[in-house]
Amino acid sequence: MPNLKAIRDRIQSVKNTKKITEAMRLVAAAKVRRAQEQVIATRPFADALANVLYNLLNRLQYGDVSLPLLQQRQVKTVALVVVSGDRGLCGGYNTYVIRRAEQRQKELEAQGINYRLITIGRKATQYFSRRQAPIEKTYVGLNQIPTADEAGSIADELLSLFLSETVDRVELIYTRFVSLISSRPVVQTLLPLTVQGLEVEDDEVFRLITRDGKLRVERETIAQEVSSFPQDMIFEQDPIQILDALLPLYINNQLLRGLQEAAASELAARMTAMSNASDNAGQLIGTLTLSYNKARQAAITQQLMEVVAGANAL
């Protein structure tokens, strides 16, 4: 017969665990909102910067433009910037982005191209360190909601590697946010820049809302308007000098957007994982409660049978 006290203790333990997972789900949900607000707050600057660069490059694309960040050279070494999380308890978030990085490594090796890793996040750093992969630089302990200063320091390192010709291309591997239950690891080329790479596309904004007592995601496509410069516009400075000053800002902004997307994906994955854990805990509590009631009923029945048997013996 099952021990009633052991079952009661386990029910209480599962209830305590459920309280923890539910609290973690709510915290992750609040941080997803903050991540979204940060993306929206940085959008006006990002849109204006992309618009200026787009028009300048189109104005100069038939001229003699020679800028280091636009230089296309033979690719011998690629820097792979892998963005992961510092912690677990977020489902397969870290596993998927690491798997995509390994897939990209194999693709480069098949082409005879060397690679160097720049890991952002403790999970990717630990994984590739154990496998003695060629890690150039590591960044751990960043804010859960990325800041412009953090993105700027990483961007400076990437620019230094590219301009010194230590690497010939820089690729960012991060997790793009799709929905609360879906994300997609992607590879984006940061350097060198091309005119096509600066083309402005419609962007999607996700908003976390509450409907019928449940958290949901609303997606909105925002068409970004591109205004053209007048053909007779006169620049006080040489347009090439303007480009040379703005391109590093654009790289910084692109990296920040990637880090923000990755942070939102991690938080959404953690929220989903904790929600599933809470649901599983509820089901386990129900199963244990049923077992407890059956065991208690069996114990009472056994006691009644013993009383009746004793009375009959008299």
UniProtKB/Swiss-Prot annotation:
<dbReference type="Pfam" id="PF00231">
    <property type="entry name" value="ATP-synt"/>
</dbReference>
<keyword id="KW-0472">Membrane</keyword>
<dbReference type="InterPro" id="IPR035968">
    <property type="entry name" value="ATP_synth_F1_ATPase_gsu"/>
</dbReference>
<comment type="similarity">
    <text>Belongs to the ATPase gamma chain family.</text>
</comment>
<protein>
    <recommendedName>
        <fullName>ATP synthase gamma chain</fullName>
    </recommendedName>
</protein>
<keyword id="KW-0813">Transport</keyword>
<dbReference type="GO" id="GO:0046933">
    <property type="term" value="F:proton-transporting ATP synthase activity, rotational mechanism"/>
</dbReference>
<comment type="subunit">
    <text>F-type ATPases have 2 components, CF(1) - the catalytic core - and CF(0) - the membrane proton channel. CF(1) has five subunits: alpha(3), beta(3), gamma(1), delta(1), epsilon(1). CF(0) has three main subunits: a, b and c.</text>
</comment>
<comment type="function">
    <text>Produces ATP from ADP in the presence of a proton gradient across the membrane. The gamma chain is believed to be important in regulating ATPase activity and the flow of protons through the CF(0) complex.</text>
</comment>
<keyword id="KW-0793">Thylakoid</keyword>
<dbReference type="GO" id="GO:0045259">
    <property type="term" value="C:proton-transporting ATP synthase complex"/>
</dbReference>
<keyword id="KW-0066">ATP synthesis</keyword>
<dbReference type="GO" id="GO:0005524">
    <property type="term" value="F:ATP binding"/>
</dbReference>
<keyword id="KW-0406">Ion transport</keyword>
<dbReference type="InterPro" id="IPR000131">
    <property type="entry name" value="ATP_synth_F1_gsu"/>
</dbReference>
<dbReference type="GO" id="GO:0031676">
    <property type="term" value="C:plasma membrane-derived thylakoid membrane"/>
</dbReference>
<keyword id="KW-0139">CF(1)</keyword>
<keyword id="KW-0375">Hydrogen ion transport</keyword>
